[in-house]
Design a protein with these regions (language model features):
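Von Willebrand factor
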Residues: 24, 52-108, 130-149, 153, ...
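Extended, H/D-rich, highly charged conserved domains that either
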Residues: 8-13
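Active-site-proximal or metal-binding-adjacent scaffold patches in catalytic folds
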Residues: 29-43, 49
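N-terminal basic, Ser/Thr-rich segments that initiate or prime the first beta/alpha elements at protein or domain
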Residues: 16
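Acidic, Ser/Thr-rich peripheral helices and adjacent loops at domain boundaries
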Residues: 103-128, 182-189
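Short, small-residue-biased leader/transition segments that mark boundaries at the very start
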Residues: 1-3
């Protein structure tokens, strides 16, 4: 039996990077339709490699009042760094409480501006099922969803059709019933 002082701590930034890089990696494959030009002059015909780009990444942020500005800013800074490394075609921020209050869309060349230009909205209760409902209503098909919340939900965890990572802030006793859960201690931010 381990006391809470002896339990290993996972760096949430590394865990977040790991989720994004494994879930959202572009598809690499090779094709014989276009031979690799580097070897043709030597008379060797090899397939050329093709990498598909990463599509859209959705970041859904709980704005029910329990997520402070400091945590939000640091989390978005880390997400921005991850997005630069993975290079998704777009990042969509969804601010939610009992409904999606704001939907912001950033193309790949705008990722540096996320922290400076975002305008969080909300402040009501906490009903996360509004996020997958909104995504279905708007026919969004992201490669993955990252949710930042304190885990104190007023309803269910929702039904998700895409890989989902729950970043639960300062609530070690709550684990999402769908997707992967990452617990974050605000003192680590």
């Amino acid at each position: 039996m381990c006391s809470s002082d002896l339990q290993s701590r996972v760096d949430w930034r590394e865990a977040l990077r790991e989720f994004v890089s494994t879930t959202c990696s572009g598809n690499d494959y090779s094709t014989w339709r276009r031979p690799n030009r580097r070897y043709i002059s030597a008379g060797v015909y090899l397939p050329s490699g093709i990498t598909e780009t990463v599509g859209e990444l959705i970041i859904a942020i709980d704005t029910s009042g329990s997520i402070g500005g400091r945590e939000l800013s640091q989390f978005l800074g880390e997400v921005c760094a991850i997005a630069k490394a993975v290079k998704p075609q777009a990042v969509r921020l969804l601010y939610w409480d009992t409904k999606v209050c704001r939907d912001e869309y950033y193309m790949q060349d705008q990722l540096d501006d996320i922290v400076k230009s975002t305008k969080p909205a909300g402040g009501g209760g906490t009903m996360v099922e509004c996020v997958p409902e909104y995504m279905r209503e708007k026919q969004m098909r992201p490669q993955a969803v990252i949710i930042l919340t304190d885990g104190y939900l007023g309803g269910s965890w929702g039904t998700w059709d895409v890989p989902t990572l729950w970043c639960i802030l300062d609530n070690k006793h709550t684990t999402a019933s769908v997707g992967k859960t990452l617990h974050i201690d605000s003192s680590d931010m």
